[in-house]
Amino acid sequence: VESGIKRLNISLDTLNPLRFKQIARGGDLETVLKGIERMLELGIAIKINMVPMRQSNQEDILPLLDYCLERGIELRYIELMRMGHLNQDSVYQSEFLSMQHLLDEIGTQYSFERTDAPFDSTAVRYKVPGKGYFGIIANESEPFCTSCTRLRLSSDGYLYGCLSNTARTYVGDLVDEPTD
């Protein structure tokens, strides 16, 4: 908080400890959840990003939304992207869940309405009356490439203009240089 952090985006694909270890390739779910609770206590706004996948975590779609709505956290479902090993048709097709599939599943438990979003938003945002919001980043169902204004900095110092493209620029040296 003293550093000026006002908001965090956290990737969390499940509330199941075993599944968490599989998807995250290690780590401890309880530590992540305690960290989320602590950030909320400090007044830091949180958005949680989940990539729903048919075989890996489909049963977590509603429980994670429940968790987020109970805490005033906006959950962003992100459609699976064709990246890395997921670029293989067989893997991608067995795991991909469309925006409509997500809306249908959420609709079994919640009423919701689509809300207006800023022009440069990558998410389609929905309001659950009296509960909160969730969003869907539907890069496959509703591509937004022409209006995307995002740049991404990887943990190893590369700047990406698009997650669907392998083009990147190393800026790690610039980030590491002290400023006057």
Model-derived features: positions:
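Radical SAM/AdoMet-radical enzyme domain recognition
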Residues: 1-76
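Short histidine/acidic/glycine/proline-rich micro-motifs that form metal-
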Residues: 51-55, 82, 92
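Short, compositionally biased low-complexity segments
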Residues: 74-79, 159-160
